[in-house]
């Protein structure tokens, strides 16, 4: 097993360990020992096709078999410690046991980590692989390896594995989920590579609402148009689809709410509009949100929409926005015209972008020409970290060829 990787290629070795583990869990689910796991998945109404498509598996109650399997294949404890599959406190123990296993794959369909779910009420409900050189939670999304090929006009962000799987089974194969962590700028940049439009469908409880509110500015900063799907009265997409079906969920997608309007509507819950003081405070907070729009046209469009939907006097709101913007040095008022303009124009970023592109090009050249440099860099930088789509695609080929031990510059360029 190890000899198939080039000497010193730790990334290749870790990749093979994960592949062996995924195959082991997959077979356990379909064995007599995996009956409890398979019964659980069937109870969750997952079809055989869906279970197979996502490579779902099972970690049995008896531990030690996976460790023995890997040791028999020649992997030593030093590399197994870094795999995230075992704990070494008071002896060697498998991290996952008596759990349904969700293999986590990168965009190239390589297993980089695992998620495990208990079948009862034990805590923690979900257990994820620790971060390793292969597995960076902030730069990977569950289901993206399939969703990126969906050809849908958007991506749907969910909270958990089961939401993604349930949505894919119902035909919404553009669904993805962050990996036990809040949405990060890295996630947003990753989504931007494949779409300009994102729909948020987090749980409808208070925690889900807070998570959506945290995600919205991150997605906006990445240049993504964002809407929020209303799941009420159900908790999550899995529950909604089971109760109402795919057609009803599509209607919720079609009627998804603009993220800014969602923010304002959520904000309104903290105010009593029957009280003049509370109403004024609400309108001040709305004005403060509107001031954040840098472009006058966009700001004016949202101002009109907010005033129309929430029945706020437009003239009063326009004056408040102008005053707040002027105080913060964001907006200036043209004398007598009553119009708002940004005080500072954005400077073009062309020089900075050219510099980044040149740096990525140089890095790729070094990676292709020097194996030692690749081994050092590959532990920290992945193909999806390249900002330029062209270079990201080239990097994917480079990493793939180094993994197989057959580097061919001609094939990479082709």
Predicted regions and their residues:
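Single conserved hydrophobic/aromatic residue that forms the stacking wall/gate
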Residues: 1-8, 12
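Non-catalytic interaction/clamp surfaces of large macromolecular machines
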Residues: 10, 14-52
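Phosphate-handling DNA/RNA-contact segment within nucleic-acid enzymes
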Residues: 10-20, 39, 62-194, 198, ...
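Short alpha-helical scaffolding segments that buttress acidic/His motifs in well-ordered protein cores
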Residues: 21-25, 41, 55, 161, ...
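Short, well-structured beta-strand/strand-turn elements
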Residues: 44-57, 171-181
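Short linear loop/turn motifs
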Residues: 51-64, 84-87, 95, 316-325
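Substrate-binding/catalytic subdomain of NAD(P)-dependent oxidoreductase enzymes
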Residues: 56, 68, 303-307
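A charged alpha-helical hairpin associated with nucleic-acid processing machineries
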Residues: 106-108, 148-154, 182-198, 202-414
């Amino acid at each position: 097993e190890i000899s198939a990787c080039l000497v010193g290629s730790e990334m290749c070795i870790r990749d093979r360990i994960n592949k062996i583990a995924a195959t082991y869990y997959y077979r356990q689910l379909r064995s007599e020992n995996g009956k409890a796991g398979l019964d659980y998945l069937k109870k969750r109404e997952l079809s055989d096709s869906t279970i197979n498509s996502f490579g779902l598996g099972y970690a049995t109650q008896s531990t030690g078999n996976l460790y023995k399997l890997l040791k028999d294949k020649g992997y030593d404890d030093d590399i197994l410690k870094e795999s995230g599959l075992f704990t070494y406190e008071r002896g060697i123990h498998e991290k996952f046991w008596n759990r349904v296993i969700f293999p986590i794959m990168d965009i190239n369909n390589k297993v980089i980590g695992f998620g495990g779910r208990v079948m009862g009420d034990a805590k923690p409900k979900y257990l994820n692989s620790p971060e390793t050189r292969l597995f960076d939670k902030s730069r990977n999304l569950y289901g993206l390896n399939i969703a990126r090929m969906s050809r849908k006009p958007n991506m749907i962000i969910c909270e958990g594995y089961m939401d993604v799987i349930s949505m894919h089974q119902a035909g919404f194969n553009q669904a993805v989920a962050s990996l036990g962590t809040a949405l990060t700028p890295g996630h947003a940049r990753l989504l931007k590579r494949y779409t300009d439009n994102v729909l948020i469908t987090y749980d409808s409880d208070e925690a889900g609402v807070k998570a959506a509110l945290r995600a919205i500015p991150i997605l906006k900063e990445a240049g993504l148009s964002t809407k929020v799907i209303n799941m009420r009265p159900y908790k999550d997409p899995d529950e909604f689809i089971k109760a109402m079906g795919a057609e009803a969920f599509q209607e919720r997608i079609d009627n998804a709410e603009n993220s800014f309007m969602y923010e304002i509507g959520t904000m309104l819950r903290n105010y009593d509009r029957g009280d003049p003081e509370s109403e004024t405070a609400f309108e001040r907070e709305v004005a403060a949100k509107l001031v954040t729009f840098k472009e006058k046209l966009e700001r004016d469009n949202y101002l009109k929409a907010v005033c129309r939907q929430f029945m706020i006097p437009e003239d009063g709101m326009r004056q408040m926005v102008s005053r707040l913007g002027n105080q913060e040095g964001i907006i200036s008022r043209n004398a007598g015209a009553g119009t708002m303009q940004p005080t500072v124009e954005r400077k073009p970023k062309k020089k900075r972008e050219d510099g980044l592109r040149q740096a990525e090009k140089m890095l790729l050249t070094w990676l292709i020409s020097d194996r030692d440099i690749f081994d050092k860099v590959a532990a920290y930088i992945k193909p999806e970290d390249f900002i330029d789509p062209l270079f990201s695609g080239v990097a994917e080929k480079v990493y793939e060829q180094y993994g197989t031990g057959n580097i061919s510059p001609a094939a990479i360029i082709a």
